[in-house]
């Protein structure tokens, strides 16, 4: 049972719809996607009936065809709405904008359909999916199987809803729902590992063994990229730089380009302020001088602020706690496959600091291998691309006729 599943009322097992098993260990070892330049990915002609992989996160939604090395399109997970009165009738209609097009229009009401990795507004989520599938990929969804990623801690009803949307709204011929952490493991060509994922809305550590999550050892921290951006914006305001809502992209740009993780926070903090200062030129021509803010921002991932009633721990301690909760016979294998994933793990210095602190928290004899792929912000999507393109996976799709016979509960039989 995975960490997402609660105790749903499931229909009795049906012998005619067995849950296929995959021997992925040997398959994934041989399955590597071509490492082509990103510009080439979008230039491919889309297959007429190829599977489409959809990974919707708090910050961005990634979409592309199975078998490709990277998602073809990445769009901000934002929908902007404004009433518009048509010329032919008096009834106002709602005009919508997706992604950056919405963020750049201050007159719009913005909706973020995903909070802390979980879809909370299905209408807005469907608008984004339709836009990316029909407008960006230019495909007819009735011709393409759809693979959706599903985050840890999502309610089981969300998986049922994904099945309904895929078949009822998008008219897909087949679909599948896959665990995000399991897909991240597949992206590394493995079936077991400790996934350390810090993205835009949430951070979690999930042990995965032989393609299955270990829910009892999963850790969660409700602090990630969006919180770092807000913290940096607060420090920029304190330095005298006026910021509006439309400047959040500027703050994000500063965070990604200039912020770094200090090897030793106390030593870095003790450096003279002048040694740390950098003068940055912003896209609009303004300049801002920053110093210790550049490493104080991502430090939150290692020393999160206390919350009333809670004492959250940093990401390395979360990983150590996950390892301590798994069976001793699994610990060595997982410790040698610690997989950094998510865009907030891309800071310069993150991997080295994480490994140093994790080793400090483990017994001296522990052997730890931390892997950090350059494309780890796409790990979930890449894992989905690999899985959906495997020949042995094709019997695992939830088919339309199975949905029509069994309803959305079919997801518990055929999907992880």
Curated annotation (Swiss-Prot):
InterPro entries: Actin, ATPase_NBD. GO terms for biological process: acrosome assembly; fertilization; single fertilization. Keywords: Cytoplasm, Cytoplasmic vesicle, Cytoskeleton, Fertilization. SMART domains: ACTIN. Residues 1-23 are annotated as: Disordered. Pfam families: Actin. GO terms for cellular component: acrosomal vesicle; actin cytoskeleton; perinuclear theca; sperm head. Its main location: cytoplasm. It is found in: Cytoplasmic vesicle, Secretory vesicle, Acrosome; Cytoplasm, Cytoskeleton, Perinuclear theca. Testis-specic protein that plays an important role in fusion of proacrosomal vesicles and perinuclear theca formation. Belongs to the actin family. Interacts with ACTL7A. This is Actin-like protein 9. The gene is ACTL9.
